Amino acid sequence: MNKFEKSLRFIREKISSDSPFYGKIFLVGGCVRDELLGERYSDLDLLIDMPDGQKKFVEWMCASFPEHCKGPFYYQRYGTTAMDIIIDQTTTLVECVEPHIETYADDGVSLLETRFCTLEEDAQRRDYTCNALYKNLSTGQIIDPTGRGIDDLKHGLLRTPAEPNQIYRQDPVRMLRGIRFKHQKGFRLDDAAWQAILQQHDEMRLSSPKRLRDELNKMLKARTFGEGINDLYISGLLAYVIPGLSDYLGDADQHPRCEPGVSLWQHTRTALSVLCHEHPHTEPLMKLTVLVLDIADIHGEDAAKQILANAQIGKERTISILHLVQMYKRFRSFYRNREYVGRPRALSHFIVALGQKKDDFRRMVRALNHQLRYENQLPFQVFYDEDFVPKERHQHDRRTGRRSKAEGSSAPSRSTSPSPTPEQLEQIKKERNHRRNLKRREQRKRKRQADRNRGADTAD
């Protein structure tokens, strides 16, 4: 039970049958949707079905249970009243509203006023039918005022309760949220909703950068993040979410290291799809690294840095991503035509420098290998064994080179030895373990002999 579920249980226990709020409090929006999908709550929004109910309820909770409820906090512009519920030393923000209708100016964006209404009218102003569901906290009954919300949820359909252009004009971020739901929840957008997004995408310029950043951070957790970025690019929303990125995705030129006909965005999109499909819980940091790596490789790190700055992901994450980009370039410099050309022990030192990021880096390298020409693919298998053979081979090459020079002949080229196969790597690992065991056995034998000699000297 997470903090939202604990807070909801606390509220439910405090609303007795003789309370004026009994039967008037509804769980609303994404909370009901996630519950029906069998997922945990990620926020807590309540609707109080009475005029000024949000103020009355929060004020009553804070006055009646001051040790657990802190507030109230008023947000006059949106007609919202909130409170902090503290349970087990964990604080949860609970936002409360009344069912209301919003009146906008002629531009469809400027909010003029809000007024109390019925649940049916309140449902018509919400973004999608699957989010226009209400659960009565007292009875547990789920109400579907649009008559389509539960059915659309079962079929994974994102449809607006009212005319899509009107819904998106009131809050343009709803367009971005629809694409996020599509790739985060596995839903599909209604055709009318998608056409409205194509028509209304310029309205996104009116949205605050903070809300756009929050939606991007949520989309980074999607299993089909690469396809989500592609949908944002096609719809025109990407220009507002990550300004500048569209300029590079629209470049149809051949990627210099890829197979014929593969552009920069085709390679990046494929790598993201492979990474998210094979490892659904990949860290957002690695996804962002793959997103800008080809751009940094072809157009320079300054271009990638500018895109990350436009995405407002934070200075620390930007530094980490650029560091991973540099590490990838360094790893690639160890190989030429799939042959190791680095200095002795350089690869071992590189793997140690990766630290806990080694597995994530290996997965990224493997994903980026897709659609690269064979000679440009990098051996991600080396990250399975830190005592990789190039170190030993180069030590042998150096000894051979010195011997060859003494005999008046030139040293063999480093690039003449092929990269080892996975079977050879496994054999090398077994031989290494065998040598280590022999060494330890010999050390124990010498220690026992020393102990016996010490005991004999004491007896004398």
Predicted ranges, named:
Residues 1-460:
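Catalytic cores of the polymerase beta-like nucleotidyltransferase superfamily
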